[in-house]
C-alpha cells in the first residue's frame, strides 16, 4: 500500500473517531494493534481492547479532532503522522495518571493531538498518540497528587 492510500485511511479513521463510527474505527486497526497513550505505562494491545477504551473515553470526554484539514499530515514509508486541533469537554469521570478517579469537571479543553501510525495491509499495527497531558489536566482544573514516603535517613 502506498503513502497516499495510508494518508486517506488516516483521514477516514479520524472521521470515524469524530462520528463514533466504531465499525470503520475497528477496520482501521489490526487485530493485534499496539496503541500507546500519554500517561499510560503499557500500550493497549488488540483491536477490541482499543475499541473498548475508546468507547469509554467518549463517556469521559466529548471531543473532536479538526482533521479537515489537519494542521500537519504527511507519510513516509509505512508511517503516517498527523497533527490536529483537539477540542472537547470533560463530561464524565476518568482515571488520572496518578491512578485516582477524577470526577467530571465540565470544563472545556483545546490542544494539539498527534498520531504516528504504522500501516500494514490497510490497518494500523502500531499507533502512538501524543498530546500535552499536563496541559489537558491544567485546562480541566485537575491537580495531580503524589504519593511520597518519608525517607529513612541513617543516624550519624
Please give the residue ranges for each predicted region:
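C-terminal and inter-domain tail/linker signature
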Residues: 1-156
Amino acid at each position: 500500500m502506498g503513502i497516499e492510500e495510508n494518508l486517506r485511511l488516516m483521514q477516514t479513521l479520524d472521521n470515524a473517531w469524530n462520528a463514533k463510527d466504531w465499525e470503520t474505527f475497528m477496520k482501521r486497526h489490526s487485530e493485534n494493534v499496539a496503541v500507546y497513550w500519554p500517561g499510560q505505562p503499557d500500550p493497549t494491545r488488540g483491536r477490541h481492547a482499543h475499541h473498548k477504551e475508546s468507547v469509554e473515553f467518549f463517556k469521559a470526554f466529548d471531543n473532536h479532532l479538526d482533521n479537515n484539514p489537519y494542521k500537519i499530515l504527511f507519510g513516509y514509508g509505512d508511517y503516517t503522522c498527523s497533527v490536529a486541533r483537539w477540542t472537547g469537554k470533560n463530561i464524565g469521570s476518568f482515571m488520572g495518571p496518578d491512578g485516582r478517579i477524577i470526577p467530571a469537571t465540565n470544563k472545556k479543553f483545546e490542544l494539539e493531538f498527534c498520531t504516528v501510525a504504522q500501516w500494514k495491509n490497510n490497518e494500523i499495527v502500531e499507533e502512538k498518540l501524543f498530546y500535552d497531558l499536563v496541559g489537558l489536566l491544567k485546562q480541566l482544573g485537575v491537580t495531580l497528587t503524589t504519593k511520597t514516603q518519608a525517607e529513612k535517613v541513617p543516624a550519624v
